[in-house]
């Protein structure tokens, strides 16, 4: 089961580019996080509420596949969707340039539900209201 794509626009800042005048590769992972954070806010389970409830979602795997560079002042669209939401959570990403719809990067991150002691938890049991909000987001989209 996967959700629809959640989209957010971002303009490439000068500080995100390198000596080759393209976006430094690590910034794409930062943009993945921006997309993920905003998507979680839209599920009704924003990171702030998760953390206040003692639930953390650390990244345990990250992959990015580079297709074309982004450059200073490009307007990009960060697309994020949730594709797994059980013991592990998987988010998929696409970053495209708005002007020509060119795919710049795609990838994914995998996360684990853990408590403050970094011990794995079952979200369905630990926080059923949060689990149901995420499940509802998946099924309605």
Where are these regions (language model features)?
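Intrinsic-disorder/low-complexity, polar/charged segments enriched in Ser/Thr/Lys/Arg/Asp/Glu/Gln
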Residues: 2-9, 61, 75-77, 88-90, ...
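Hot-dog-fold acyl-thioester-processing enzymes
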Residues: 2-59, 116-141
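Hydrophobic beta-strand positions
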Residues: 16, 95-96, 113
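Ser/Thr-centric signal marking residues that sit
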Residues: 17, 80, 109
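Solvent-exposed strand-loop boundary residues in beta-sheet-rich modules
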Residues: 99-101, 117
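Short helix/strand-capping connector loops at secondary-structure junctions
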Residues: 108-118
């Amino acid at each position: 089961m996967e959700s629809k794509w959640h989209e957010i626009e971002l303009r490439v800042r000068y500080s995100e580019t390198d000596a080759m005048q393209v976006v430094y590769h690590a910034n794409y992972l930062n943009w993945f996080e921006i997309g993920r954070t905003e998507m979680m806010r839209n599920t009704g389970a924003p990171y702030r509420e998760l953390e206040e409830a003692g639930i953390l979602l650390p990244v345990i795997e990250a992959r990015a596949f580079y297709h074309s560079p982004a450059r200073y002042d490009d307007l990009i669209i960060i697309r994020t969707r949730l594709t797994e939401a059980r013991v592990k959570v998987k988010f998929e990403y696409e970053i495209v340039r708005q002007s020509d719809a060119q795919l710049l990067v795609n990838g994914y991150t995998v996360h684990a539900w853990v408590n403050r002691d970094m011990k794995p938890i079952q979200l369905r049991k630990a926080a059923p209201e949060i689990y149901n909000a995420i499940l509802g987001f998946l099924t309605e989209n």
